[in-house]
Amino acid sequence: NSIVRKRIEISTNENRGQLVVSSDKYSLVDNLFYNLHDYASQSKHNIIIDDGKVEKLLNLICNVLDRNVNELNDSVFLIIKDIEKECKYYVSNVLYRSVGSRKNRGREVEWSSYKYNKEFNKVLDKGIISINNEVLKFISKEREGYIERVESIAVTVKNKILELNNNIAEVLLSIKNKVIVLNKESVVAKVEEINYEVHNKFIKGNGNTNFSNRNLTEIKSILKELNKMEILDNRINKLSTKESDLLKVIKEILDSNLIIEDKQLAIEKTVVEYELTFFRHNMDTHETRNKIIHNIYPKLNKAYTELLANYKLNRYSKIKKSIHLISNKSEGTKSKEMIKLIVVLVILYIGIDKCISYSFYQIINLLTNARDGTSRTNIAINLGFRIIKVLKYIKLDENPSLNALYPINKLKDEISKLDNEGIYWIGDTLLGLITANCDIVVEELKWNSGKDSQLEVRINDKFISNLTVSGINIVQLPMLTEPRKISSDGLYFPYINSDTTNLHLFEGELIKGKYNLRDHTEASEMLYSSINYLNSIKFKINKAMLNFILAEWDNKDSKLFKGYNMLKPILETDSKEIKEEKVSSNSKYTLYSNIISLASLYKDNEFYLPVYVDFRGRVYPLSNYISYQGGDLARSLILFADTKCVLNNSGKECLNVYLANLAGYDKLPWSERLTKVDGIIKEYLESNEISNTKYIEDNIDKISEPFQFISIMYAKLLSISNPKANISNPILFDASCSGIQHIAALTLEKELASNVNLYTDSSNPKEDYPQDFYTYALEKIRDKLINSDITELRDIKLNRKIIKRSVMTIPYNISMAGIGEHLMEHFTVKTVLKYRYVVIPGSATISSKDVYLDYSKYGQLCKIIYFVLTKELPSLRLLSNYFESMIDIFVKLNIPITWVTPSGLKIKYTNIKFKPQKVKTSVLNTSKITTIKLPTDSLDVLSTKRSFMPNFIHSLDASNVHLLLNSVSYKNLPVYTVHDCFASTANNMFKLEKLVKNAFINIYFNDEGYLLKLHKHFVDTIISATDPYLSNGNIENENDIKGLTTERLEYKPLLSSNYVADRISTKADIIKIPDLPAGYKNKNKNINEFVKGILNSKYFIG
């Protein structure tokens, strides 16, 4: 019996025949179980006990004793005693039955074995019946008592109400000396009417309709079903059979009695150990994934053994020879031999088993979460960096003979000197050992362009679904303890065990650099305090939502999962297109499966989500499964923990608006969204009678985030059912076109600001429709198309959905080719009489007929859109021209482009060129010549110009978040951000909105404004690298030199005669410093208007 419960021990005192009762009922059923089996086994009658009846009897006894009712317990104890007594009787006695005849009436024969068995097991049936009868008698008696008590209470309540009504009647009669004829019945009716109105006033929030009692009953029924934990546990148990061994071990740790800190440390060590011994952990089980591993391990082990065999012979004689040869070579000629030696030493020190396990595990992880691409070069370099970190775990005494030959500290020192080519050698050797000896990881030529052909690495389609589920490492798990604070010198070790951080993060760095940037971003105190606060926010899993999701996950016809809740087997006969579709679908299955598995694991634990920062200051959670920056499914499962949020009036309003937003009404005025809520709820309740997903299925075109909609719907229903309920769901409001909001603020262009809801002078903004910049841009594009010289273009009207992606990338230097690619996501290509055409669907044309464009005319369409988006928005054009002029100067002077963000980060934007180089890692005979790209000291001018604007705008976005978190920390609000989206509990959203606005205002409109500060910084940087030049007038050309001065140039930013001379150039090149955009001519007046308009805007976020 595996039932876990409080136990009551009953032992039989055979001498006195008494039952001894203690505090453990499990021992009672244990003793009965063992006694019955002992009786049966000791019997000479071959009694076979019916285990099904025994289990039924024991479960019934446990369930009855759970009630802790003395009267019932006494009855059960006596029944148990009778059962044991009677069973023992059948075992210890020889029994007979009469077989007499007329001649021999007294003849008897002993019972058969069948008869002994039947009577013995019949005792168990009698015991079950007796206990059930006792339970029924008790329940009947208890029910009679309940009825009496309820009737008594009802009489008391009725008398109290009548007494209260009499008092109310007297008060009403005395008001203003009016004579009112009342009786008790009318007063009762009036009181009920008042109560009903008060109740409905709460329920409807800001709506204008009421809910019936049937609605309320239905709401309670929905919530009750969602909160049935036994159903949730059953679904999780079903899911757990598919989990990896790693997740099962983590579950055991989470379910243990360890303190929180020890649990976290145990999980960290378990995951790291699992990665280092991946194969050993998975060799002996029978799951499909592990059968694959079992089959390939011998091949990999043989390959490693053969590689190292020559080096191990005669006490490492070959290594000794290599060391000797290298020591006699000059620095310039020993590099390849040194790298080859390092590769061998790394494998020897780490060991074959750990090298196989860790490299295989990391390759699967890199290919599953391919942020830096899947070229062989990228995978090899990343793998090289990761395997080197494992050396930190190697102790000096682990391999004394090898350490005596080549000390590990000396090896680490040599590794620290390696460039990307050396790191590539290490990673490529390990990758080559796997690709050459198994077909799980395969290579394919991705771009076939002669010498520039590049190998891509991927998981074989046959194995991808079975292997990627295992690719979970420690940084993808939530933390049970609050992440460690960033130290005073900027070191970041969020995990309890420092080695965990070193192995998986960036050597204790908060800011993750970018491979093509020469310089690292310098952090600031504000960044540190912001990250420390964000890391301190505690979360928990939304169990009701998890219950819903698990049920939907098992539904093969789920419209919400769109088929991604089932693995699609990839067949040899599948076409390339079908295989790609299946691989993509299975990838989403793996993502969803991991999210659900981890949510199930952590459902009973509060947790934290540590973050890291990219070079621009943008914040990202380390976990990409349980993450508030994840997709719809992940965000729907997260609640704030440690928050007491009983909805107040502002909370009700924000919850209602967010529900309306998720239902697809986010383009309506704020006030109209509030009126939609009751209708949404009533329609949902009606649909729920058919299916709990029918409402979403019927409104799938409007609801883009169905899981979050369900999550917020349940929160709303809970608040209706229980006004005192704690509603800790994150309410997420996002900025509209935040990149363009930053451009409007930088340039102080009021029209643009108004079109992105940054600014409004409305007297009642809640009644206004939110501005839609996409529609604004679409109208400008349509004006150009209708006046086109090309007949086909005049029939094209496009729509908001088609141009949205292109408009979103306006602040990020959209190209004409980029626009063409974005548009093709909505168009098709057809061949007619050997000519290929782009087909514009009838839904995007005035005539409602398909329009066929040849590629020349399609190019004209793209050109018109590009012209409108880049040239007809004056502020964007002015700002782009200004930055391009500044970048030209920095490039000409060969100095890095630097800026200090409003939150104090110092960013050096130095995109460098890479040169291709052919490399063959000679450690393996099977290694191939591969072209890798190595960094140079030269700046990549084209890349810098193209990518400066998006990275600059993102750094401002990030600063807004840093300033917000800094101010939020003083108010101790629960909060998270998704770059330009902001979340808190419903009651705190208006406070958060104000703080977001204040942070934005502090960036652009306090003191002299950020663009002027940035301009001065640019000028100071330029002046420090040049000689000042003073001119008596305007310079017509570079030869018009009036004189140089050694005095520092005092730059006057609003004048147009500021020049410097390039001190490095052989000819005295004169450089004009560009002016600020035009909006700054009336800066002070514009700033005051902007601040007032921002504070007045209802849709800045929301």
Curated annotation (Swiss-Prot):
Family: Belongs to the phage and mitochondrial RNA polymerase family.
Location(s) in or outside the cell: Mitochondrion
Residue positions of the active site: 734, 804, 980
One Pfam family in the UniProt entry: RNA_pol
Gene Ontology terms describing biological process: mitochondrial transcription
Chief location bin: mitochondrion
InterPro entries given in the database record: DNA-dir_Rpol_C_phage-type (IPR046950), DNA-dir_Rpol_phage-type (IPR002092), DNA/RNA_pol_sf (IPR043502)
Protein name: Probable DNA-directed RNA polymerase
